[in-house]
Amino acid sequence: MNRFQAGLIQSAFYLGYFLLALPAALVMRKFGYKTGLVIGLLLFGTGALLFWPAAVVQRYGFFLFALFVIAGSLSFLETGANPFISVLGDPRTSEQRLNLAQAFNPLGCIAGVVVGTIFIFSGIELNPAQVAELKTGGKYQAYLQHETLRVITPYDVLGCIVFLFAVVIMSTKFPKIAEESESAGDAPQGSFRELFKYPHFVQGVLAQFFYIGAQVGTWSYFITYVQDYTHLPEKIAGYFLTGTLVVFTIGRFLATYLMKFIAPSKLMGIYSLVNVILVAIGVLLPGWIGLWAVFLTSFFMSLMFPTIFALGLKGLGPNTKIGGSLIVMAVIGGAIFTPIMGRIFEATHSMATAMIVPLVCYLFIAYYAFIGSKARLPQPALAISR
């Protein structure tokens, strides 16, 4: 697989997220959060099961389509679950609820890495001489097919588990949400035009765009940074990357606790400024000091996605579902900032210099946390007495 084909994996994933966020919001605006979540789970299960025929026919495009379906399902789930958790309860603690729920996301990532390592990756790494020998003997295609077929069982099991979750959600009675009760009547169900009257929401979409760019960019090039400046082998660098997921998880659970004592926006602002300092160290002091500095940014970025989401949705009322979809669409930042970092790396031959991109992203997030996130609700027009 060449670099262009590898890049299509990221494209398929982010396009799935981006393109299905608005349809997800429209479905949920008409039928409610529960329907949207069930559709998301059914799409996920379908996407997982599509890996079976994709592996059998050995077509790269088929794998991309399956991945696109899974990404689209995640768009449904994010567009539904995040706003639902945000409005389910006291608005003053929406950031805590969302951080707690999102804390299980990296746990799933870690579990996925473990499952992939055990059940998908065979651990067999062929050197060029061995590959040439297999090709000469006409056995290389059989070897590739055998390796590819290893994805079938894990993805089939995953698909079945997700379908089971869909059944559980279908049979679960959801609590009544105020905005859905209003939507069921004659009250307006929200519109895109209305959303632009909320500056904290518009800036929240931008903040999420910058955050995803910083997160994906940092993690995408972390192994390159480690290898360039410490000369560790790729496998050991991979362990460091897994470690970032661990500290990311710890950070979310700890942030949920700290929000009992510190305002979420203030805490995010402090964390953002800490990351500005840490990334600056990574830029100016590449090496072991820079490595640990960039490593620790995962801890301090952990609260940003759910906190930005909750802050951006505050006070949107019937516009919450559509607003949530636009914040989900901001994940496209990962597909934009990562190539920018790559171009900087190619131009300067310095991964440390490319880290300036996430540094700038954290500066904007700090601004949003301290200033832009203050909810300013649109004021109704005053009647003029005559």
Locate the predicted segments by residue.
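Glycine-rich segments within core transmembrane alpha-helices of 12-TM secondary carriers
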Residues: 96-125, 325-338
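Central cavity-lining transmembrane alpha-helices of secondary-active solute carriers
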Residues: 8-29, 242-254, 333
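C-terminal ends and interior cores of transmembrane alpha-helices
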Residues: 42-57, 273-287
